[in-house]
Amino acid sequence: MIKQRTLKRIVQATGVGLHTGKKVTLTLRPAPANTGVIYRRTDLNPPVDFPADAKSVRDTMLCTCLVNEHDVRISTVEHLNAALAGLGIDNIVIEVNAPEIPIMDGSAAPFVYLLLDAGIDELNCAKKFVRIKETVRVEDGDKWAEFRPYNGFTLDFTIDFNHPAIDSSSQRYAMNFSADAFMRQISRARTFGFMRDIEYLQSRGLCLGGSFDCAIVVDDYRVLNEDGLRFEDEFVRHKMLDAIGDLFMCGHNIIGAFTAYKSGHALNNKLLQAVLAKQEAWEFVTFQDDAELPLAFKAPSTVLA
């Protein structure tokens, strides 16, 4: 059978919090079968757990948060969540001694390296996928996102940014998902923001960790980072990275075709909640062997080495 995945060992890293600008220690721990993805704040006494759940997601101007019933939150979970989706990690406990996951370089790549460093272990329990059975679409003005039935996982994302640094040929990105494709084509794409927004937020004591080290920064005319872009279409690739993380907030890889136009964290989450709320639109599935498993989810050699 296709088995659930966790880590082989505990790994730790440090980074800077996007909101506070302070050092954050991140610890990733293996977890037993059927634990799911759990974020944990150890700066609180007692520590507070936040299971990944579409209904717990809140989108703020700066990041995605998980919020519990007491309005306690953990922030900046989206890029790590994308790395978990990319590598198909089903069970993990993610600890931080702060209210937020460190921003690292603004992409998912540092988290991918950390997960690969921990090693990936298979548990003797069937991995559950969410399979889309009916088309579900959500809209917000001219923005929209939808899932259609498809035996695999494809993503097709279009942005519409009128900016000199983003030419029209760099506004759409489509891919057949796999762990290899995620690592090579998506994981290194960084988040982006306007210099004026960062300066304004910092003047109000917010976004204190925001810098050229953790984002693509633009003014009205150009990219300000000395090293420029990692991909010509890094902006839309990062929006796809965000979507992969947002859609994994249900804790399961999804079998279906995702298409979006000008979507963001909030609309991605609205789509995920709309799918899960419509019982006839999806089902849980497991697979007995590799032959049945959609190509998108076959483990690459680098992961289960």
From Swiss-Prot:
GO MF assignments: metal ion binding; UDP-3-O-acyl-N-acetylglucosamine deacetylase activity
Pfam family, any one: LpxC
GO BP: lipid A biosynthetic process
Cofactor: Zn(2+)
UniProt entry keywords in alphabetical sequence: Hydrolase, Lipid A biosynthesis, Lipid biosynthesis, Lipid metabolism, Metal-binding, Zinc
PANTHER family given in the database record: UDP-3-O-ACYL-N-ACETYLGLUCOSAMINE DEACETYLASE 1, MITOCHONDRIAL-RELATED (PTHR33694:SF1)
UniProt name for this protein: UDP-3-O-acyl-N-acetylglucosamine deacetylase
Underlying gene: lpxC
Family, per entry: Belongs to the LpxC family.
Functional summary from the UniProt entry: Catalyzes the hydrolysis of UDP-3-O-myristoyl-N-acetylglucosamine to form UDP-3-O-myristoylglucosamine and acetate, the committed step in lipid A biosynthesis.
Xref: InterPro entries: Ribosomal_Su5_D2-typ_SF, UDP-acyl_GlcNac_deAcase, UDP-acyl_GlcNac_deAcase_C, UDP-acyl_N-AcGlcN_deAcase_N
Organism: Salmonella typhimurium (strain LT2 / SGSC1412 / ATCC 700720)
Cellular component aspect of the GO annotation: membrane
Positions with a binding annotation for Zn(2+): H79, H238, D242
Its EC number(s): 3.5.1.108
